[in-house]
C-alpha cells in the first residue's frame, strides 16, 4: 500500500506497534492507517497560522476590507435602554454622522461589515416575582427603500399568528423591501423558584450591508436621511402582560466607500 512521504511507520518485533507521524494536511490524501480524532476537523485549524492551514482555508478567506470600500475600519456605538413590549419596538442602528473622525462617515456611502450586540435583558422587582417565562425576540432587518420620518412599526412589517412575536414573518407585500438578516432571542424566567431575572446578550454577526444616506446632510444621522439599506433592530417579547427591559450596547464596524 502506498504511503505519503510525511508518514513514518515504526514497527518493532516485540510490541508490534504501528505509528504514524502526520506532517501533512488530512485533506490532501487518504491515510494509510486510520487516524482517531477527538476534536472537530474544522476547529483543529483555528489557532494555526495561515501558511500551515489547508489550501481550502487560504483560497476562500474573506477579505478584511469589503469590495468597493477603503480603510480604516471605523466604529460607531449606540447605548440604549428600551422597554420591550409585546407589540414590539424598533431602533435604527445604521445612523452614522458625517465627519472626519474614526466614528464618522466621509461621504454618503459606507458598508457595515459587522455588528456586535452586547448587553442584557432583565425584569423589574414586581415582574420577576410572578411565575412566567418571557422570551425577547430580536430581528435585524434591512430596509432596502427607507421612506418617511420613522421606521415602520413591528406590526406593520411582520405578519403574526394570534399576535405572537415568535411566529413573526415579513408580510408578503413587503418582502422585496424588508429582509431579515439575523434573528436571535433571549429568555428570562420569573417566580420564587428557578428564577432567571436577567439574560446576557452577546452576539456578533457579519452582514456586509451597503448603506446610502443623503450627501447634503452634514451632521444629522437619522432614519429619514437614509436612501438605501437602513439597518433596523426590531424587538418584541412573547409575554402579553409582562414587559422586560433591555440595556444594550450596539456597535457597528463599517468602511467608507471608494465611490464617495
From Swiss-Prot:
Its main location: virion. GO terms for biological process: symbiont entry into host cell; viral penetration into host nucleus. Keywords: Capsid protein, DNA-binding, Host nucleus, Metal-binding, T=1 icosahedral capsid protein, Viral penetration into host nucleus, Virion, Virus entry into host cell, Zinc, Zinc-finger. A motif (Bipartite nuclear localization signal) lies at residues 3-20, 202-251. It holds the Pfam family Gemini_coat. It is found in: Virion; Host nucleus. It comes from the Viruses. The keyword Zinc applies. GO terms for cellular component: host cell; host cell nucleus; T=1 icosahedral viral capsid. GO terms for molecular function: DNA binding; structural molecule activity; zinc ion binding. The keyword Secreted does not apply. A zinc finger (unnamed) spans 69-86. A motif (Nuclear localization signal) lies at residues 41-55. A motif (Nuclear export signal) lies at residues 102-123. InterPro entries: Gem_coat_AR1, GV_A/BR1_coat, Viral_coat. Encapsidates the viral genome into characteristic twinned ('geminate') particles. Binds the genomic viral ssDNA and shuttles it into and out of the cell nucleus. Plays a role in protection of the genome from degradation, virus acquisition and transmission by insect vectors, infectivity, and systemic movement. The CP of monopartite geminiviruses is absolutely essential for virus movement. Homomultimer. Binds to single-stranded and double-stranded viral DNA. Interacts (via nuclear localization signals) with host importin alpha-1a. Belongs to the geminiviridae capsid protein family. This is Capsid protein. The lineage of its organism: Viruses, Monodnaviria, Shotokuvirae, Cressdnaviricota, Repensiviricetes.
Amino acid at each position: 500500500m502506498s504511503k505519503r512521504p510525511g508518514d513514518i511507520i515504526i514497527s518493532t518485533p516485540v510490541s508490534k506497534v504501528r505509528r504514524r507521524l502526520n506532517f501533512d494536511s488530512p485533506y490532501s490524501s487518504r491515510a494509510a492507517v486510520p487516524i482517531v480524532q477527538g476534536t472537530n476537523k474544522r476547529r483543529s485549524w483555528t489557532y494555526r497560522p495561515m501558511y500551515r492551514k489547508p489550501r481550502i482555508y487560504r483560497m476562500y478567506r474573506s477579505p478584511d476590507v469589503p469590495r468597493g470600500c477603503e480603510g480604516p475600519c471605523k466604529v460607531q456605538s449606540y447605548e440604549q435602554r428600551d422597554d420591550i413590549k409585546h407589540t414590539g419596538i424598533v431602533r435604527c442602528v445604521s445612523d452614522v454622522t458625517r465627519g472626519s473622525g474614526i466614528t464618522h462617515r466621509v461621504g454618503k456611502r459606507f458598508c457595515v461589515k459587522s455588528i456586535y450586540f452586547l448587553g442584557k435583558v432583565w425584569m423589574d422587582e414586581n415582574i420577576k416575582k410572578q411565575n412566567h417565562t418571557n422570551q425577547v425576540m430580536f430581528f435585524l432587518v434591512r430596509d432596502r427603500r427607507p421612506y418617511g420620518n420613522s421606521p415602520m412599526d413591528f406590526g406593520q412589517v411582520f405578519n403574526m399568528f394570534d399576535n405572537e412575536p415568535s411566529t413573526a414573518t415579513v408580510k408578503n407585500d413587503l418582502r422585496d423591501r424588508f429582509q431579515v438578516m439575523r434573528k436571535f432571542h433571549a429568555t428570562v424566567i420569573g417566580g420564587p423558584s428557578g428564577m432567571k431575572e436577567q439574560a446576557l446578550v452577546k452576539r456578533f454577526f457579519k452582514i456586509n450591508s451597503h448603506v446610502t444616506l443623503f450627501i447634503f446632510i452634514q451632521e444629522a444621522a437619522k432614519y429619514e436621511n437614509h436612501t438605501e439599506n437602513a439597518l433596523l433592530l426590531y424587538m418584541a417579547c412573547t409575554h402579553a402582560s409582562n414587559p422586560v427591559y433591555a440595556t444594550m450596547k450596539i456597535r457597528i464596524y463599517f468602511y467608507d466607500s471608494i465611490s464617495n
